Structures are given as structure tokens and as C-alpha cells.
């Protein structure tokens, strides 16, 4: 679950990281009142769950409450990489002397937390990695031992800071890792982490992603989810316990098991198509869950055909067929649906489809044949 900047900063502040005073606003009038309360120069920052705000004009500096109100009027409603700006963070200005980069993330290759640091903050870390990879310090942390003092000293030495500012930086590194662990994050990124003219180390931005599987023990964070900003298909899938990720293609994908669904995406691409989603109905899915999954996939207006790829182990082929037929009866879906059904009770499932399915339902014996058929039907405009 991705968090807005102001949410991430609130969490980081609880772990001792220094942030600037800020107020969330949803209207230009609220932005003006926030600027009046904060006083002096403020930054008006779009709150969206994506990057590139600065380049898109989503961050403005205002010298007065009136300027803050005008900036808010321009930014609210703006589209930034497909995300509509509905809220702003009005934040006090800072006297910036240096910009650094600091993050903690899960490194799946090493299966350990990874801390990244660079003296080149304020720009995309990918750009830094391409331009000057030697400027990035990478530290793996043993999750059973934690971040050790010598590792903190190594990063502090790499920062080039000295005196009380160096100590402040070391505390920021330690607090960042504690926050990363404490909220079960998969990513905590501060870019930039700035050194002010007074020598203070401050998190000027915060990008935080919390592991969805841990939200049951972080009820407050789970309650921060912005339903309005969420993709409607992904939100509905989460409500009913389906694993769904929206993509940009036109062939809807359903399968049972993450591995099979990933393979299905590959086969559709091999057949020249573009998957519209990842949707895993899971093992043992019953007719109702199958029907709900099909409704969600078909509700994406970009979908022109649906590829239903099921290998029955725990999931029974006859239950899949009943769910598919129930979904079509309930919703009146007229998109072409290509079914590849194998495994437990597959023969019975295919018999049910042959006897009761409408003309828009097609069956194929192999995964590749089914993928080719789904791609062909999508190219024909869904007919």
C-alpha cells in the first residue's frame, strides 16, 4: 500500500525523523489559511501516489497566503501521470544547504533489507545510478541482527558531514531503518534528505510503501487507504480477496495460482497480445468467486476479450464452469471469453460449458491455442 507524502512523514516523525511543519488542504481557501498559520514562505505540494510531481508543475513555492491560494487553485484537479490531484500539503519553507538521498527497501535477490545512500539527492536515483553509479552506497542489513553502529558510521563517513550535523545524520539513518521495520514497509525513501543552513537534517520528501500482507496489524495505516484514488477494479478485488493488478492491454486474464497467471501473461504476449490485468482467483475458488473475478476483469473498459486459464488441483473444473455461466447470466457479459480448462473435473466443466454457455464462450485444449484465440478476438474488436 502506497502512502501519500504527508502520511509517510507522519509515520517517520513518530520514529524520530525530523520533518517540516505542514498542513493538508483540499481547497484553495484551506491552502491560504494553512499558509497564514505556518507563516513565511511555504511549498504547495500535490499529494499523488506517483512520482514526477515537480516536473509536472505539482510543486509551487508561495511567498504569501494569496500566492499559496493561487498555486493551490492551479494544482488541484491537475492530472499527474494518470493521478488526479485531490489534496495538497502546505509545508513551511526550508533553507537548504545540501540535498542527499536515503532509502531502505526489501532486496529480493539477497532476501535482506537494503539501505541506499547517495550525496546526489533531489533527482531520481535511477538517473544517479546511470550517470555515476559509484556515488551510491549500498548496505545490506541482517534482519536478525539489525542495523549495526559500524554501518551507520560508514554511511555518515560517505555523507561527508561533520560535527553535530554528522551525528544528526547518523540518527536519521538509524530512525529510518527503525521506521522501515516498525511499519513493515517494503520501501521508505527520503529524496531529498536535506541539510539546512542551521545544520539540521530534515526529510523534505517521503515515499513509503507498506506491505499489504502486514496491514492486519497496522489498522490505522490500513484506514488511510484513499478509496477515491484507487483503481476501481483493484479496490473491488481487494474487498473480495482477489489478487488483481491492472495493466494497459486489452486481453483480460484470469487464472488460479500466481505462477500460472504469470505464465498466461507471457503466453498472451508471445501470441502478440497485450494483457489487460493480472487476476489470480486462488486455489479452491468456488462458483461465486469465479463469477466476481470475471465481473471485475470485464468491467475494465479496455478489455476486448477474456482468457480464462484454469488448471484444476484444489480448484474444480465443474465449479469454474458454473461460476463462469453464473457470471454471464448475472451481468450479461457479451465479451468473447476463451476458456482453457484442465485438471480436476475438467471433463465435467467442459461438458457444462458445451451445454450451457452462450456463443461468446470458446474453449481450447492448450494454453497457447487459447492465447492465440483470445488475442485474435481482441483484435477483431471483441466480436
Swiss-Prot record:
Cofactor note, please?
Answer: Binds 1 Mg(2+) ion per subunit.
Tell me which UniProt keywords the record has, alphabetically: ATP-binding, Ligase, Magnesium, Metal-binding, Nucleotide-binding, Tricarboxylic acid cycle
Chain residues that bind substrate:
256, 313-315
Task: Kindly list the positions annotated as binding Mg(2+).
Answer: 191, 205
Q: Which reaction does it catalyse?
A: succinate + ATP + CoA = succinyl-CoA + ADP + phosphate; GTP + succinate + CoA = succinyl-CoA + GDP + phosphate
Q: How does it assemble?
A: Heterotetramer of two alpha and two beta subunits.
Family assignment from sequence similarity = Belongs to the succinate/malate CoA ligase beta subunit family.
What is the name attached to this protein's record? Succinate--CoA ligase [ADP-forming] subunit beta
Amino acid at each position: 500500500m502506497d502512502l501519500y507524502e504527508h502520511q509517510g512523514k507522519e509515520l517517520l516523525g513518530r520514529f524520530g525523523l525530523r520533518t517540516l511543519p505542514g498542513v493538508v488542504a483540499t481547497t484553495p481557501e484551506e491552502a491560504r489559511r494553512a499558509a497564514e498559520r505556518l507563516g513565511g514562505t511555504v511549498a504547495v505540494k500535490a499529494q499523488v501516489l506517483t512520482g514526477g510531481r515537480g516536473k509536472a508543475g505539482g510543486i509551487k513555492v508561495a511567498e504569501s497566503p494569496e500566492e499559496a491560494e493561487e498555486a493551490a487553485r492551479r494544482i488541484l484537479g491537475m492530472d499527474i501521470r494518470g493521478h488526479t490531484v485531490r489534496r495538497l500539503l502546505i509545508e513551511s519553507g526550508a533553507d537548504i544547504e545540501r540535498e542527499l538521498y536515503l532509502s531502505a527497501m526489501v532486496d529480493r535477490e539477497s532476501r535482506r533489507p537494503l539501505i541506499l545512500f547517495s550525496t546526489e539527492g533531489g533527482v531520481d536515483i535511477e538517473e544517479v545510478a546511470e550517470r555515476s553509479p559509484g556515488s551510491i552506497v549500498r548496505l545490506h542489513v541482517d534482519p536478525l541482527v539489525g542495523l549495526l553502529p559500524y554501518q551507520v558510521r560508514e554511511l555518515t563517513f560517505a555523507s561527508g558531514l561533520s560535527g553535530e550535523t554528522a551525528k544528526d545524520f547518523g540518527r536519521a539513518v538509524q530512525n529510518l531503518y527503525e521506521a522501515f521495520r516498525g511499519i513493515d514497509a517494503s520501501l521508505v525513501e527520503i529524496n531529498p534528505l536535506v541539510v539546512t543552513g542551521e545544520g539540521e537534517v530534515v526529510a523534505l520528501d517521503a515515499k513509503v510503501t507498506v506491505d499489504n500482507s502486514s496491514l492486519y496489524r497496522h489498522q490505522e495505516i490500513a484506514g488511510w487507504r484513499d478509496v477515491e484514488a484507487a483503481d476501481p477494479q483493484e479496490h473491488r478485488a481487494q474487498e473480495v480477496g482477489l489478487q488483481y493488478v491492472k495493466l494497459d492491454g486489452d486481453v483480460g486474464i484470469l487464472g488460479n495460482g500466481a505462477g500460472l497467471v504469470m505464465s498466461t501473461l507471457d503466453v498472451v504476449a508471445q501470441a502478440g497480445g497485450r494483457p489487460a490485468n493480472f487476476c489470480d482467483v486462488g486455489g479452491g475458488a468456488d462458483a461465486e468467486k469465479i463469477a466476481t473475478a470475471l465481473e471485475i476483469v470485464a468491467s475494465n473498459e479496455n478489455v476486448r476479450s477474456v482468457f480464462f486459464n484454469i488448471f484444476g488441483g484444489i480448484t474444480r473444473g465443474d465449479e469454474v464452469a458454473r461460476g463462469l455461466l453464473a457470471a454471464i447470466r448475472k451481468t450479461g457479459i457479451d465479451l468473447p471469453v476463451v476458456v482453457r480448462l484442465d485438471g480436476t473435473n475438467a471433463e465435467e466443466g467442459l461438458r457444462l460449458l458445451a451445454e450451457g454457455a452462450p456463443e461468446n464462450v470458446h474453449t481450447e485444449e492448450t494454453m497457447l491455442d487459447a492465447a492465440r484465440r483470445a488475442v485474435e478476438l481482441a483484435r477483431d474488436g471483441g466480436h
